[in-house]
Design a protein with these regions (language model features):
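A glycine- and charged-residue-rich anion-binding loop/surface
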Residues: 1-59
Length: 59
């Protein structure tokens, strides 16, 4: 799956990942500061598992 981040960069994963796991992949500081995610415009919990291509913003 391909995750498109707010800045336009893309991350590719072979398996499903939670929003918090992706945040840790980007930066430990980001993951610690995160309180939610926004997936395709919808606010979701950090434990939400992403299985398909989407746009992600860490909040």
């Amino acid at each position: 799956m391909i995750i498109t981040l707010k800045d336009g960069s893309k991350k590719e994963y072979a398996e499903a990942k939670s929003v918090i796991d992706i945040a840790y992949d980007i930066s430990e500081g980001l993951a610690r500061a995160a309180c939610a995610g926004e997936v395709n415009g919808e606010v979701v919990d950090l434990r939400t598992v992403l299985e398909d291509d989407c746009e992600l913003n860490i909040l």
